Amino acid sequence: MKKTGKIGSILCLLALLGLTGIYALPKVYVLYQANTGKVDICLKEYMLEEGKEVPWKNGKDVLPGGFVSKIPRIRNDGVECYVRATVSFSSQKESEKPLSLENLEGISSDWVRDGDYFYYKHTVKPGEKVELFQGIRIPWEWKTPDEDNVWKACVRAEAVQAEYFSPDFTGEDPWGM
């Protein structure tokens, strides 16, 4: 019995020393630090009037098949970023041939369309400006008086910081959102 008690005491002491040894091992910490920058873009619209670029003005009368000069320009006022934009149309009256993204003209090959969005394929550097399109072609089908309509084209732009971000322009959703 005395022998068993000694062996048990020795085993307990060894176990206690072993556990203490494990806790005495050096610890390793991994720190991952990511810095975010300021993503800041500005969208302004312009038009050509008598060959000169001027700020966009509403209320232009356009004939069927006519072209409306409208130049949405996105300026990067923050860190390097990727930009995407969408255009939505609304009108006071319904039409058999409503305006759609197909009516946009002058879209550079630097933009890729996926669904309702146009994605700029390159990063936009601080201070850089990119233009989405140059204008809107009014459908030829708008010939009847009931299509004497007031319509709006609303452009919305979004940006995401380029650092730590890799869009996939071959996939279903380039930004994966």
Language model segments and positions:
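Long, small/polar-residue-biased beta-strand-and-loop interaction regions
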Residues: 2-177
